[in-house]
Swiss-Prot record:
Paired cysteines (S-S): none
Domain of life of the native organism: Eukaryota
Protein name: Maestro heat-like repeat-containing protein family member 9
Record keywords, A-Z: Repeat
Database matches in SUPFAM superfamilies: ARM repeat
InterPro entries per UniProt: ARM-type_fold, Maestro-like_HEAT, Maestro_heat-like_prot
Residues in HEAT repeats: 118-155, 252-289, 292-328, 357-394, 418-458
């Protein structure tokens, strides 16, 4: 009986060994190809770096070469697999050296670019973006290279007399998201990179304020080694990240940081979107006052909500936080959209007016917008200013519609009482303006009237509105009733009910009559209203502020205006 020699390999084993050898040979060839490719790319990048070409074209061409090199790097086998290739110690050592040389070439390319121009730190941001788009690209060895380049930059900026690194905010946003990654090795490298970045930003700040830039002058001490310095405050702690980033970055860079995170809310990766939301909200809670370009951010949120509202609550919370620190900018932007407002815009209005602390500022901004006249051209507005970027000014219409949302809120009760005279008078102006433009505005002409009714009802004057409704006043006002008769009727009805806001309203009307409104029709409305309410017993209401000689002269001016309003007795009849 024949026996098989144990040393004899079967055909299957021979085939397996052959496949393994070819596979290893393929890996070796891939390393050699990466090595030769990176050497070639390095020479091209350095040649472009030394040429006198347009900086933007130079950067774009270099970025394409960097991306090509990046592609070679990420498909390389891991170091452990490289070690498996060798059959002897010398061969393994050669493969390891080749592996490390490839990484060193890529690192040298980046450091040579950054050493000449800190603007090219933007390349690191692009690398992080590439990794965020494909999880297979997110490798510890790439993060180590990024950290080494940032560490090299730290040593350079300590000797600079000026630091211009405009991409720090965008780079910080990408790194901050990786500080909450599931892989501890990625978290370690990202948090370390964040410390390097913030050190660069602190140097930039200190140079700008003529402070010394040695390591002792910063709370973020320059690390002595990667092993010793583990900034645990950044690891899985989004609140700390937001605090330190907000404290360190200059306003323009912090704005870039916020805008970048805002864009991440639309990421198809739920983890990225969730982490971005947390860091974004923390940042605005701590440092919203440093954010610039608020109008642009509000507009970006509106467009994102229109396209995709998966993170709607977070975006609306951003509106709320920005309104707390920049109410005027937020409200002006929210009023500069088509009228009538869509559901998305109304939700943003509600978010903007959710805090009682900013209610007075919101109403003051709306009153400022309501100084404009719908359809008024640029050259007809006082001092040549406009309230809208459009050919015509329709922001007052949006403001009237917004008041219908703001005024009934309980958080606005105190502010509405404070600004009742201004709101009442301004809305009467707007009702008149809209009645003039009714053929053009159509249904939109009723927003001012609706806002006026809401103001009456939320100011304890429901009976006034009921009386006006019984008299069919609102319907007539929107049809063919002479508006000056309407002003007289509103004033008379308010006077009959002895509305509690009478002293403040009379004082404000008198102030307007003395100072003179911007338009002649405003003057007519003010004086008709003022004359009507002045028939109330002023002594009983302690309206000692009514200086009759001046008022008489204003009333004479009213009679002389050629506005076809008839005699005042006709108006009162």
């Amino acid at each position: 009986m024949l026996t098989r020699n144990p040393k004899t390999k079967s055909s299957l084993q021979i085939l397996q060994d052959s496949v393994k050898w070819h596979h290893m040979a393929h890996k070796v060839n891939s390393l050699l190809d990466a090595y030769s490719g990176l050497l070639s790319n390095e020479s091209m990048i350095l040649a472009v770096n030394s040429s006198f070409v347009d900086p933007l074209l130079q950067f774009e061409s270099q970025l394409k070469i960097i991306e090509s090199s990046f592609g070679m790097l990420v498909v390389m086998p891991s170091l452990d697999k490289v070690k498996e290739m060798g059959s002897s110690y010398e061969y393994i050592e050669d493969m390891e050296n080749l592996y490390h040389n490839i990484l060193n070439i890529y690192e040298n390319i980046l450091t040579s670019l950054v050493s000449k121009d800190l603007y090219k730190l933007q390349i690191l941001k692009e690398m992080l973006v590439w990794m965020s788009k494909d999880s297979s690209y997110l490798q510890e060895r790439i993060m180590v290279i990024i950290n080494k380049v940032l560490r090299f930059t730290v040593t350079k900026v300590r000797k600079y007399i000026s630091v211009d690194a405009p991409c720090l905010g965008l780079l910080a946003a990408e790194l901050s998201l990786l500080c909450s990654h599931e892989d501890p090795s990625i978290v370690k490298q990202a948090s370390l990179g964040m410390c390097h970045l913030l050190y660069i930003a602190r140097c930039q700040n200190d140079i700008g304020t003529n402070k010394p830039t040695n390591g002792k002058s910063h709370s973020l001490q320059f690390p002595s080694s990667d092993v010793e310095f583990l900034p645990k405050e950044f690891q899985q702690d989004e609140s700390k990240i937001a605090q330190r980033v907000g404290q360190t970055l200059l306003p323009p860079l912090l704005t870039d940081f916020v805008q970048s995170l805002l864009m991440k809310l639309s990421s198809p990766d739920d983890k990225i979107a969730s982490d971005a939301a947390s860091i974004l909200i923390f940042t605005l809670e701590f440092h919203a006052e440093k954010v610039t370009m608020v109008s642009k951010i509000v507009d970006a949120i509106y467009r994102q909500l229109c396209d995709n509202n998966c993170m709607k609550d977070v975006m609306l919370q951003v509106i709320t936080l920005l309104t707390c620190t920049s109410p005027k900018k937020v409200i002006f932007q929210l009023m500069d959209y088509p009228v009538p407002a869509d559901d998305t815009l109304i939700q943003m209005w509600k978010a903007a007016c959710s805090q009682a602390s900013v209610a007075p500022h919101v109403l003051k901004t709306i009153l400022l917008i309501l100084k404009g006249k719908p359809g008024e051209m640029e050259d007809t507005v006082t001092e040549g200013k406009r309230f809208s970027l459009d050919i015509t000014n329709l922001m007052p219409l949006a403001a009237c519609q917004a008041l219908c949302t703001f005024l009934p809120l309980g958080s606005y009760r105190k502010a509405v009482a404070q600004y009742f005279p201004q709101l009442l008078t301004t809305l009467m102006f707007q009702v008149f303006y809209n009645s003039e433009l009714k053929p053009i505005l159509k249904d939109r002409a009723l927003y001012a009237q609706d806002a006026l009714r809401v103001l009456l009802n939320c100011s304890g004057l429901q009976q006034v509105d009921i009386t006006l409704m019984k008299e069919n006043f609102w319907d007539q006002l929107s049809e063919d009733l002479c508006y000056y008769h309407g002003v007289c009727f509103i004033a008379k009805t308010l006077s009959e009910y002895n509305f509690p806001q009478f002293p403040e309203t009379l004082s404000y009307l008198y102030k307007l009559s003395v100072e003179g409104p911007r338009r002649s029709e405003d003057t007519v409305i003010v004086l008709i209203f003022l004359t009507e309410v002045s028939f109330v017993d002023c002594e009983q209401l302690c309206s000692h502020f009514l200086f009759l000689p001046k008022f008489k002269s204003k009333f004479q001016f009213l009679v002389s205006l050629p506005l076809n309003v008839g005699s005042y007795q006709d108006l009162r009849s």
